[in-house]
């Protein structure tokens, strides 16, 4: 697997989280498998490659790939505006987080507790989602930049949905961190757009 493919898998994770946040905000619904994939990515330590972070394949990242393609193609008919806004906000928040060793320490110290909960209850159990959401609230929500989520207030006001959204934002920012560690940079989205698209088209044609 090339470094560019590894980067695109990680960036696909950012956009997948963004798509799921938008879906929950607008409809109150999202696939458990998709949510589980993103929450699981928070708990993977020392993966052998980027795919292992997301469960060993990219089946649950395909919606993220499509949203990323829509952003890179700049086609108004395929552009998913809110997911793009959330994804870019997560990339920005990750850069802020990288300067805050105290918050990184808090995240590192609390993830093992969430890991224990996940082993006991399962990845998509409400306790695991609530703990992941609380970790986002106690760390990333304290930064100057905040992500404003738009949607249907009937769904946004439900505590379980709010926790899912925060947990997914945390997972998306973890994917953004991975993308940057692999050499990803926001300028690529502007100046290497065609190269990224060609690689993404190939990845989306390949069965998971």
From Swiss-Prot:
One of its GO terms (cellular component) is cytoplasm. It is a peripheral membrane protein. It holds the Pfam family DUF489. The keyword Ligase does not apply. Gene3D superfamilies: HflD-like. InterPro entries: HflD, HflD-like_sf. The keyword Membrane applies. Keywords: Cell inner membrane, Cell membrane, Cytoplasm, Membrane. Coiled coil: none annotated. It is found in: Cytoplasm; Cell inner membrane. Belongs to the HflD family. This is High frequency lysogenization protein HflD homolog. It comes from Pseudomonas putida (strain GB-1). The gene is hflD.
